[in-house]
Amino acid sequence: MSTNSALNRLKWIRRNKDKENLTNQNAKLNFSGTMLSTLSPLPISSFKKISNHKTNKEDNKNYFHWSEGDISLGRIGETSTASRKENLTNAITYGVDRFKEDNGVEGFAIRYGLDDIDVGDVGSNLDSRTYNITYYNTSPMKNDTKYIDKIFGIGRIESDILTKLDGTNVTADRTGHQIYGTLKIKDEYKKNNLTFIPSGQIDLGHTKLDGYQEVGSGAIKVQDQHITTQNLRAALALVDDLSTDKYTFKRHGKLEYLADTDRSSSFKYNYVSDSSSTLIDNLETGALHNLNFEVGIDIIFPERFSLFAIYERNQTLDNGYSGHTDNLYLAIGYLPNKDTEYAFSLNGSENLVSNFEIKKKINDYNISFNLAENLMNLGEDSNASINVNKVF
């Protein structure tokens, strides 16, 4: 699930809501300890002025875009019920959004990821492809300081499983689907150059992994598996504005408590050679009590460029379960050419199709790129086209 990508997008907008829009090209390095985060933060730095007066309709028609590539490296040590795991993830995210008449923001983000997980020391491996589409929305509740953020997303997972058993290969394919959402309420209190931002948040998600049957000696048949996510968060963030007439400079930090209230899942299976008995393993990951710490900077230069950096640490607090995740986020932003247009739309009734289009005018030529995705069959029904027209 990737709800934090949208939340970080909205946080950037509000920290810099007195500036013009920027488009972001991001890079993320994520070095994980014994606890891997299931909600991976993705920083985005595109923003436009949000003022107290009502914006005009032409402004609300403008769409702004952001893109991001990320690399995640992680390791989970061996436990009494699971082998050691090493993880490598590569992903690309692209999003578009617009500003609403109520001074809010709404948009969509599309993410494609590749996961490579090595299990144990004998060559067992899990390769996965993930597809996610996330809708995000923020609206003021009473004034320009109190906002409610709403996130909703769907995803598809395709996995290739290789198990090394007594020197032989046991293989299987598995697919899954997920739905997730976040509701966050936050307020702002300003004193001189400091802004204090308390917030409360709830994350909900459900993933269904389809059953599968391995092929090979000692193969097992696995039933459908359901995994539920339920997090409660309370946080206090601080933004210090040190801007000058030549550039914008803001440093910010956050301290957050997270309660992971649902961490278990049942893994039900039987051996192909003996279907008379069903075995059940109760899997539990993570800790109930967690503390997240974050520090970062935003720098905006006058010539269309911006720099964005965050260091984040997620630390477990439970006795008997020790783990942490260290994340480093880096981003460089640039204001796009005014002759370039971006658009995102959803259409359909029985089949819901998303369309993303980029149009650019170069001299007398109009160049457009269109990407269409059937949301009912993520990763299976996609179309891309490039068109070039000359204006006489």
What are these language model-derived features?
Residues 1-53:
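Long, low-complexity repeat tracts used as extracellular stalks/passenger repeats
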Residues 1-12, 16, 59-392:
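Membrane translocator/pore-forming domains, dominated by Gram-negative outer-membrane beta-barrels
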Residues 52-60:
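Short boundary motifs at domain starts and secondary-structure transition points
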